[in-house]
């Protein structure tokens, strides 16, 4: 699951998930690769960062994808081996003002 690190102490990280639950984990339990989770109604994974782009997959709430990059209001993600674009507001795991480059 995607988590946000909200505090650090030595080798421990306090994390928060998309539902707001918090806890401490050892840093070795965390991956350096970012993930996001679809948090709203069914969304279409699109071929380009545009509402008019061809749909590549239909994603249900709770689907997790690998975060590749974000450009403006869109994020490029990989879900089950399919690369595509989702609107940033439709996922949890990346902040609205955060720059993400691949």
Named regions from a protein language model:
Residues 2-58, 64-66, 70, 75-102:
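Boundary regions of SH3-family modules and the immediately adjacent low-complexity/disordered segments
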């Amino acid at each position: 699951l995607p988590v946000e690190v909200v505090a650090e102490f030595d080798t421990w990280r306090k994390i928060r998930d998309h539902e707001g639950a918090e806890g401490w984990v050892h840093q070795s339990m965390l991956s350096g690769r970012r993930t996001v989770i679809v948090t709203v109604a069914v969304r279409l994974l699109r071929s380009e960062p545009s509402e008019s782009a061809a749909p590549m997959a239909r994603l249900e709430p709770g689907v997790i994808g690998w975060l590749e990059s974000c450009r403006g209001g869109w994020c490029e993600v990989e879900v089950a081996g399919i690369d595509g674009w989702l609107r940033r507001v439709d996922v949890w795991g990346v902040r609205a003002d955060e720059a993400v480059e691949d």
